[in-house]
Amino acid sequence: MKVLALRHSVAQVYADTQIYTHDETKDDYENAFLISNLTTHNILYLNYSVKTLQILNKSGIAAVEIQKMDELFTLIRCNFTYDYIEDIVYLHDYSYYTNNEIRTDQHWVTKTNIEDYLLPGWKLTYVGYNGSDTRGHYNFSFKCQNAATDDDAIIEYIYSNELDFQNFILKKIKERMTTSLPIARLSNRVFRDKLFKTLVSDHSKVVNVGPRNESMFTFLDHPSIKQFSNGPYLVKDTIKLKQERWLGKRLSQFDIGQYKNMLNVLTTLYQYYDMYHEKPIIYMIGSAPSYWIYDVKQYSNLKFETWDPLDTPYSDLHHKELFYISDVTKLKDNSILYVDIRTDRENMDWKTWRKIVEEQTINNLNIAYRYLSTGKAKVCCVKMTAMDLELPISAKLLHHPTTEIRSEFYLIMDIWDSKNIKRFIPKGVLYSYINNVITENVFIQQPFKLKTLRNEYVVALYALSNDFNNREDVIKLVNNQKNALITVRINNTFKDEPKVGFKDIYDWTFLPTDFETNESIITSYDGCLGMFGLSISLASKPTGNNHLFILSGTNKYFKLDQFANHMSISRRSHQIRFSESATSYSGYIFRDLSNNNFNLIGTNVENSVSGHVYNALIYYRYNYSFDLKRWIYLHSTNKASIEGGRYYEHAPIELIYACRSAREFARLQDDLTVLRYSNEIENYINKVYSITYADDPNYFIGIKFKNIPYEYDVKVPHLTFGVLNISNSMVPDVVAILKKFKSELFRMDVTTSYTYMLSDEIYVANVSGVLSTYFKLYNAFYKEQITFGQSRMFIPHITLSFSDKKVVRIDSTRLNIDFIYLRKIKGDTVFDMAE
């Protein structure tokens, strides 16, 4: 949902939009909670409170102040990510298709011939890093830029088996126009940028597990971050390959040679970062014009020095000349070298050309060896061709996508590799590598071992759920890693499947109860965003491709109502109850009936079950930003930090009742996952709360009324307001609590409206209006370790007779309290109080 805050109402009516006017009788937290549970996507928030907007944004719900009508029109028609700290709106708006254009934030693409293959009459537009060049389009009171691009489709095309780009991009645009927006993917770059800047400033050592190409720009300015990936393809790994011949295959209609060069250099750069944790000088020989340098410089102040007879406009220092092996002495330590020398074929015959290429390959290799033979802190990437070669067994092979698969590949070496054992590799084996292997990632660092790191902050986004990891080892890492942000795939199945297929892999699935964490926040993507100064207009959908975000070591853990809080917890329930169900009271009715409470009068205002916990369980797929386990734990230890709001603390027994209702719901829905989740949450409640039951009571609290509107034959009709199992020495403690609650007890609006047979020969009158105070009293006794209440649900009633009687129904009648007392069962009254 998105909340657009206005000082005045608007005349125009928008689809899927609801107006909420700030309620001055409620505080900012209560207003935020009410807004978050509205069911439309767009909320126009009138007479708004800035504090309420802050609360919503911290909860991951985008809430933006609107000053002008064009701001409202722009934000209401598309989704966006909001940096509420810097007041920047990142639109995810593809309406630019109506200008017959596709967009990119990678400058090198604009220098290709891609426009020859676009839809007729269409053009390509460069919009800058995260759409920064579009800021001039929006003259708004907040900073605004459109981060939507078609780079995802362009890159997917490059790695696909499709050659016809026009058909491919047409298909992708049609898909985008007919499917739900992949909002997490669109906002992810904004999130990653913010995340790692924050972590690097707060932690001396940061480890990142499983980065992919979409992060290749994110880490350019963070050389200190240790990366773990799937490892490199080494020269020695070619021993598994059979010999093949030249294949020759076109991968792309437009020229992607620059993309290949950029990937080669970035792969080399991240190898250098992995070894030396600082920024090097980047030397490049050949590969002009290297327009992609412009892209790199949008993210980092890396320095480039280049040699090529052709211009390289974005190099910091360009030598418009050839580079010879004697020039290696000009190259300094603390650097990387990219050797991409290859003479143009022009009109040469194949044999002459092949001879020159092989000579240049040897020359390239010699330049690399010479460069690595002296000095320190050096890594080299060199262009090679398929030919009989001796190569260091530990050197890394690269074959990033290029326009045509021919005979070229690349080799990365560091100083140690260049001096390592060399192995003869036949030309046919290298052709086999070229024909069958595409390097899919610029991060080729070693795989991560699932072991706790003592001094590091571990980030593992979408990296650990794969079933080649041991599931128990993943759980141990989450439980024991002190500082971390780790995601795992949430179990969205209805049959409690332990793993699910996704694309061409299988992932383990998890529930929050799989983890034993007492100082970690377990939330959703949008809940996590709120903790890093971001919010989002479109919450995650229960697609099956959803992840739990687990933050360990965060200073926000105790701020229960500020982050990963209960905002939107009733939203799915409202959507169902007010559109599909038998009555809008269906949730209240079901919760009472499933706990054998058949008095449904006033069930919507006096419910005996925690609606928060019930909704968090049965609708967990729709809203798991609320960290239910943390909420339970912090209340059980009395450590919850509550900033504001009319905050009701549930008695632990109310939580148990909610689990029982959720379990019944799961059985009716044949939802095995919710069934397990409910059982495990109930077990967790019993673990963190020391709940004892007065199933063998020796004292009870009684309430005698001045008026009973029914006939009765018992001596003193009364409401048993709970039973206790206490020693005689604890009586003063019980009395002290009753005195503390005196005012609230006598203020109860107690009513009755019918009689019924509670069981054989027990004739009773119903009592309404007491449950809320009962549970507050329960909490007070619990905190003093006084056993109060039974394991079965408390059903308030007044016993009228121990014989069968006819049921009577009357108009709701108020019962006036005469006095309240504490009495020993089959004994004397030890305390009483009147108003």
From Swiss-Prot:
Please tell me one Gene Ontology term that the record gives under cellular component.
viral nucleocapsid
Protein's GO biological process: symbiont-mediated suppression of host innate immune response; viral process
Give the span(s) annotated as N7-methyltransferase activity. Answer: 171-245, 429-555
Molecular function terms from GO? GTP binding; hydrolase activity; mRNA 5'-cap (guanine-N7-)-methyltransferase activity; mRNA guanylyltransferase activity; RNA binding
Q: Where is this region: 2'-O-methyltransferase activity?
A: 246-428
Task: Locate the active site.
Answer: H718, T720, H797, T799
Q: What is its main location?
A: virion
From the UniProt record, list the reaction(s) this protein catalyses.
a 5'-end diphospho-ribonucleoside in mRNA + GTP + H(+) = a 5'-end (5'-triphosphoguanosine)-ribonucleoside in mRNA + diphosphate; a 5'-end (5'-triphosphoguanosine)-ribonucleoside in mRNA + S-adenosyl-L-methionine = a 5'-end (N(7)-methyl 5'-triphosphoguanosine)-ribonucleoside in mRNA + S-adenosyl-L-homocysteine; 5'-triphosphoadenylyl-(2'->5')-adenylyl-(2'->5')-adenosine + 2 H2O = 2 AMP + ATP + 2 H(+)
Q: Sorted alphabetically, which keywords does the UniProt record give? A: GTP-binding, Host-virus interaction, Hydrolase, Inhibition of host innate immune response by virus, Methyltransferase, mRNA capping, mRNA processing, Multifunctional enzyme, Nucleotide-binding, Nucleotidyltransferase, RNA-binding, S-adenosyl-L-methionine, Transferase, Viral immunoevasion, Virion
- Matches recorded under InterPro entries: VP3_Rotav
Subcellular compartments: Virion
- Region annotation GTase/RTPase activity: residue ranges? 556-692
EC number assigned by the record: 3.1.4.-, 2.7.7.50, 2.1.1.56
- For the region 2'-5'-phosphodiesterase activity, what residue ranges are annotated? 693-835
**Comment block on domains:** Contains a bipartite N7-methyltransferase domain, a 2'-O-methyltransferase domain and a GTase/RTPase domain. The C-terminus contains a phosphodiesterase domain that degrades the 5'-triphosphorylated, 2'-5' linked adenylate oligomers produced by the host cell in response to IFN stimulation.
What this chain does, per the entry, is described as: Multifunctional enzyme involved in mRNA capping. Catalyzes the formation of the 5' cap structure on the viral plus-strand transcripts. Specifically binds to GTP and displays guanylyltransferase and methyltransferase activities. Has affinity for ssRNA but not for dsRNA. Capping activity is non-specific and caps RNAs that initiate with either a G or an A residue. Together with VP1 polymerase, forms a VP1-VP3 complex positioned near the channels situated at each of the five-fold vertices of the core.
Q: Give the similarity note.
A: Belongs to the rotavirus VP3 family.
The entry describes its oligomerization and partners as: Interacts with VP1. Interacts with VP2.
Name by which UniProt lists this protein: Protein VP3
